[in-house]
């Protein structure tokens, strides 16, 4: 699938208790996944994850609003990053001291099944940008929420470009509520210039749909590239039914109504480096 980095702090991190959290970390380590958000020790929590993507150094941080009321064991508060401004500010400062090209923060926040962000998300996003975040990736609502590229004015008066998506939606799920089968693969074009400066030049998305083929199907769930599948049907190169085609058209409209038509991907991003994000 091409997944390189996982963020593991979310409201289900403690569902099977502390031991389950640790088992998950150990399995990810065994499989060779880079990950952040949950930790086996304070030392691990204090260590900032940095990945080199074609010469671009990206620091990754991850936080969640809570753990579904399941308490974090006393003395093991290090095991998960909860949304706390003092903690986040401390981590962002540590990340900046490592001199990455970009800092990417994943936030498990917001209200489930709402396709619009709330004031708390907006205020937290402002706080993150002001304290050093360059890219903010939201999750938890189980549906898509808007995205934007913005210019941030820092305390010293200088400006920088930042990118924010309030929710990436469900990439893979069995939920049936409206909008929960719709998601995107987010594509960011990042350029590292000859002078070492890194810029976020453009972005687009690939709209996808989680198709349920029924309990008796060999492959019950399929991830559908909506642009590709609609185009193939309209060109006579597809064996899907008219009903599925109509579903794809409807779901694509749901996505573009939330995310905007102008950034719907019609061709590959061209540039030096591309980084893609999904929420599983």
PLM-predicted stretches and their roles:
Residues 1-280:
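Acidic, metal/ion-coordinating pockets
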